[in-house]
Structure formats: structure tokens, C-alpha cells
Amino acid sequence: MIQTLSKLKVADNSGAKEVRVIRNLGGSVRKFTGIGDIIVCSVQSATPGGAVKKGQVVKAVIVRTTRELKREDGTYIRFSENAVVIIKEDKSPRGTRIFGPIAREIKEAGFAKIASLAPEVL
């Protein structure tokens, strides 16, 4: 479960390495978010010369969580880390590469471009 002030890894090459959650979008009293949800983040650490700078406020979509996600067929999927992909206003990824696997629920949530860039969709 991702909540306000959680620190997450960035799974793309936008220049950010780690972000901190400022706001969970999708409701005024929403406390937790999961895979496929959009969040507002502050960049905590970034690589020099990247498109995203430290301290910048960005939107991101959650692609991996350590909390298990139950699928409709009864199976569960869980990842070893919490990770996000930074997105633009039109929900397209800011970077050109995605690192690590992502859940197929990302594609079902309307992020087909992120799913096509990922090396593995579980």
C-alpha cells in the first residue's frame, strides 16, 4: 500500500531515481493507492543532466508494489519493490525506457504505451 510520504523507486530513464508521494489522486479522503493509480510526487534524488530535476513536482503511475494484488482468476502477484513511472499530462511516459517487469493491470488501466515499453509484463 502506497500512502502519502512513501518513498518509491523510479523505473524509467527520465532522470529521477527516487520520489516521495505528495498526494494520492482519485478522491479527497483516499489514503492508499495501488498498481495503476496516478500519484503526485516530489523528486528526492535525480541523475545529473536528466529531464527531471531534484525537487520538481511530477505525476507518476504505480507499476510495482510489495503488497500482493489479487487478480480475477484468484491468483496473487507481488513484487520485491515499490516503483513508479513518471508520466506527462497526456498519460504518456516521460522517459523512453522502462526498467524491470510491470503488472498487466497497467495496460488495462489505460497505459498501453508504458506496457509496450516494458521488457516484461506479468
Swiss-Prot record:
Pfam family, one: Ribosomal_L14
Keywords carried by this UniProt record: Ribonucleoprotein, Ribosomal protein, RNA-binding, rRNA-binding
Biological process (GO), any one: translation
Gene3D superfamilies named in the record: Ribosomal protein L14 (2.40.150.20)
Gene Ontology cellular component annotations, sorted alphabetically: cytosolic large ribosomal subunit
InterPro entries for the chain: Ribosomal_uL14 (IPR000218), Ribosomal_uL14_bac-type (IPR005745), Ribosomal_uL14_CS (IPR019972), Ribosomal_uL14_sf (IPR036853)
MF terms (GO), sorted A to Z: large ribosomal subunit rRNA binding; structural constituent of ribosome
Family label: Belongs to the universal ribosomal protein uL14 family.
Role summary: Binds to 23S rRNA. Forms part of two intersubunit bridges in the 70S ribosome.
Subunit architecture: Part of the 50S ribosomal subunit. Forms a cluster with proteins L3 and L19. In the 70S ribosome, L14 and L19 interact and together make contacts with the 16S rRNA in bridges B5 and B8.
NCBIfam families on file: rplN_bact
Name of the protein in question: Large ribosomal subunit protein uL14
Lineage, uppermost ranks: Bacteria, Bacillati, Mycoplasmatota, Mollicutes, Entomoplasmatales
